[in-house]
Amino acid sequence: KNVMVDLFGSWINDLNYYWCKQTELDDIPVVVSRTGWSGEIGYEIYLRDGSRGSDLYEKIMEAGEPYKIAPTGPSQIRRVEAGIFSYFQDMRVTDNPFEIGMDRLVDLEMDADFVGKEALKKIRQEGIKRKLVGIEILGDPITMIVPPEYTPGYFVPDHWPVNNKDDEEIGYVTSKCFSPRLKKNIA
């Protein structure tokens, strides 16, 4: 957060979650979005001029030097702890909002029409056949070991089957990790 204040000024503190603002950073046109993939205070900076990528990178690294920032990827552990979905990992285009716990965002009683409204009404009436839920996984801490056949940077499927006491598959785990904060395996 301090790096963003140093780059853009104190207005960044007033940017609400999932809001964005078009602005410039030393004549580099950008869109700043208050988002994040880990549940922490996060921002995304989108270039509006792709030719200025190196300039933007250098500005960010320079502003981050006092804070010892370094390039990295998002934290899978923090994402799972925060309950933030990863598209294709936790949900797909074939899922509906009722299955993934987003039904609070769907108003089927509104006067306005939208694509899929009738299909969603039917699903609500008939009920869902599956539900995305959070669970605790007993046992030794889960490690995030990527099999050697996967190239770094590519999607690694890690869906684990979940069986009932009769060993019948009743679902699958989409994302999992050992949470150091909670001191247990979560999914």
Residue ranges: model-predicted function:
Residues 1-187:
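Conserved, structured C-terminal
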